[in-house]
């Protein structure tokens, strides 16, 4: 055993002294209660630091806590020691040495390396014929940094030896992430083999889906028992849905649903409501065929098109990746690549673009000491810690260094030299941000746009105090709907984070070339001749912008003026312009045969973008607003009884749901109220309540019981319901709105019944045709908006409005036929030049293909 201060740059590192077995045992006695043997289910981190991308390959090695089994690099192990008092760590180090050369100058014959025992990936950039690995393990005792070499059966207590062996033999908590093996991590649903499917004649079209209970047209799930199409859960950015798919399961007990838009020949995203997780359905093709979706035909069709499709799209791959061009590798801060974990390029491209934005750099990397110091005991399960870790890894330059002796090698090898690319592996980050998500937890390719919105949700949910970097993307969209029959209008606003531009194929400027190409291609196919060179449709950006601003028909529009369904027309404008504008070109669609298709187009995206002409103007002179009346509510006969049973006694609050919400960072009392007012329906439903009410002044106030039945009048004085303004108690309003009724309905019903909850519910059921008091509603909304503004003052405006003039600074491109396949790369303009980020490879771009992008990132030009 030796005391090695040299590990930490301390003197005396070369000295060592042998100690008797009794001395080692005596040294470990105070720490024995803290040394654990890993149990089944314990995650043992041996490959990567929780705060950095240090590994056993790093210069300082890796320290594994023998109690928590978390790993830390040399720079961060002291922080964990100070925070937890854990003193015993296993130090792991892998040495890479050049093999001894033979007399002829070549390497000696390759021998089995008996000194490799760590479960680590080898460096693909090192020739195994020239280099060999040697792994080293030691116990280190803090704070004096005593070292005990391993193995040491003779001197170590039996418990310590068992614990060390268990740590060394444990597998990584992250399985080998490739498309084939990751899929096996999803369990097969126990309902798949004997799933009941109703013979109700339902057939699902390949497009035009809409939730059966609301007007949402995204995040839709097909129930595999009865063919119902319903929306998923709600997210911060107003995407997601109203949770009707889950409600349908609770009403019917039909357990399995598949997400529309994810169905490919290789599978789809299937969720089991009963099992509460993403699952595999081995009979998915049969279950989908029941509703007219023929996956086997899709597979045959894709294979039939494969030979014809791949060749034309080779040029797309070559152009976007700048194949055939000698690209200069880039190193240093901001030029770090991300290794591909197996179809993780969508994540890598989005994160490279995100951390090129100063607001995200400041929020995370700028707050690194504070975030790391106040991280939870398990930092691998904390979003802000992992975002900061990733941001530091990308921006520090610590993991993007030129290869050793690169200048000398380049002189000797010239153009034959292949530069070494370091890069970092986002395995821990991906595992955290994708957990419990049916799409991103798989290792199939995903849509970069969907991941961008998912990331924004997480940033919103885990914002650091008053700082919310995703504010730079947020903007307000004004939607104007006009009743075609009465010509009256309604103006509403919603929050969004990106601008979706349709592809105006009819505006292609090379139609004659496209027609000639299509004729030649078909002739070549029929005669089995080589296909002609691809002709790509050239679409003016102005045409896409025009298509975005044109009116669109609204299906199933309910006119409050007619109090009936009518034809409606909707136009969208910007009520505010964001600091950073994200533009998505909607290149993907489905054919009538359910095969995902991609518009292979070239859009002349501008470097400078002016959208000031799309600024919303609100109600115009001469326009008459539609009455503010909600459509009548159709309620099943048993709904009242079922809803009343949701009211629970405070002593029966589900504390497990409360703790789940509290672990997300919400105030404990707010979590208790959320679970209570949603009738113990679970953490997910309670989370939605929190989102709706988190801006209210009494959000974190303790739970106080509203009145029930005859006790309502007694409770009214507590909540101020009998005040001069007849304001209903907010808690009672929350109970009714949590049942699915509109807030305005709840207020009107409570005012009409002196805030008696039971009578208010009776009033709602007996007055489905009631008209809301518009003046009161407007006053309430103004008060709510005033509260939001006053709450937002410390953190700045929630919407960063300004000029609509922008300049392009990044874009993400997709290669392939579908978002569920292919590859993503990112181009970012840094220091006046374009740089391509292609997984772990970072190079100066010679010809950035700005016309072939999928997502574009613009920053506002200061006026």
Swiss-Prot record:
Q: Which GO terms describe its biological process?
A: autophagy; cell population proliferation; maintenance of unfolded protein; positive regulation of ERAD pathway; protein K29-linked deubiquitination; protein K6-linked deubiquitination; protein K63-linked deubiquitination; protein stabilization
Any one annotated GO CC term: nucleus
Kindly give the InterPro entries that the UniProt entry links to this protein.
Papain-like_cys_pep_sf (IPR038765), Peptidase_C19_UCH (IPR001394), Ub_carboxyl-term_hydrolase (IPR050185), UBA (IPR015940), UBA-like_sf (IPR009060), Ubiquitinyl_hydrolase (IPR016652), UBP13_Znf-UBP_var (IPR041432), USP_CS (IPR018200)
Give residues annotated as binding Zn(2+). 211, 214, 231, 244
The segment(s) forming the UBA domain are 652-693, 727-767
Annotated UBP-type zinc fingers sit at: 187-295
The SS bond pairs are none
Q: Where is this cross-link: Glycyl lysine isopeptide (Lys-Gly) (interchain with G-Cter in SUMO2)?
A: 311, 405
According to the UniProt record, list the residues that bear Phosphothreonine. 122
Compartments in which it is found: Cytoplasm
Q: Which SUPFAM superfamilies match?
A: Cysteine proteinases, RING/U-box, UBA-like
Which enzyme class? hydrolase
Q: In the record, which positions carry Phosphoserine?
A: 114
Q: What is its EC number?
A: 3.4.19.12
Family affiliation? Belongs to the peptidase C19 family.
Assembly: Interacts with UFD1. Interacts (via UBA domains) with SIAH2 (when ubiquitinated). Interacts with BAG6; the interaction is direct and may mediate UBL4A deubiquitination. Interacts (via UBA 2 domain) with AMFR; the interaction is direct. Interacts with UBL4A; may be indirect via BAG6. Interacts with NEDD4.
State the name under which the record lists this protein. Ubiquitin carboxyl-terminal hydrolase 13
Q: Gene encoding this polypeptide?
A: USP13
